[in-house]
Amino acid sequence: MTNSFKTYYVSQIDGNDTNDGLSKSSAFATLFAINRLTLKPGDRVLLARGSVFEGQFLQIKDSGTKESPIEIGAYLPESGEKFYEEVLPVIAVNGQGIWYQDYGTELDSPTHVYQGYVSSAVLLYDAEYI
C-alpha cells in the first residue's frame, strides 16, 4: 500500500501561486497558497531556504496524528545557489497575522490574557501533531 502523503513546496525565490506546489520546480510563491489547503496527516510543508515571506503568515488549521504528524521544514530551492544552504527561510509578518482569540475562560493565572488580539508568524489553530 502506498502512502498518500503530499509534500508542498513554497519558494518566494522561484515559485508561483498558479503552480500546484507539489515539487521544487512547481513551488508555490506565497504562504497564502498553503493557508488555502486542507493538510492531511503526514503532509509536509517545505519553505525554500533564502525565501523572505514579507507581510505573510502561516496558518495551520489541520491536524496530523501521532504516527503521521504534519511537518514544516526547509529545502534548497531549484536555483540551488550555495549561499542558500546556510540560510533559513524567514516569515516577516510586518503587522499581518493578527487574530482575535477568545479561549472562553481564564487561563492558569489572572495575568494571562485569555481573549484579545494576538499576532504570530505561524498560527496553529485547533491543531495538533505539527
Each model region followed by its residue ranges:
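Extracellular/periplasmic catalytic domains that process cell-envelope and extracellular macromolecules
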Residues: 1-4, 38-39, 63-67
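Boundary/junction segments of secreted and surface-exposed precursor proteins
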Residues: 2-12
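Short coil/loop residues immediately preceding or within conserved phosphate-binding loops
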Residues: 5, 25, 119
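Detector for repetitive beta-architecture
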Residues: 7, 42-44, 50, 57, ...
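Aromatic side chains
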Residues: 8-9, 28, 53-54, 75, ...
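Acidic Gly/Asp/Thr-rich repetitive segments characteristic of extracellular carbohydrate-active
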Residues: 12-48, 52-57
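Glycine-rich loop at the start of a catalytic domain that most often binds anionic cofactors/ligands
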Residues: 60
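Right-handed parallel beta-helix/beta-spiral solenoid domain characteristic of secreted/periplasmic
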Residues: 63-130
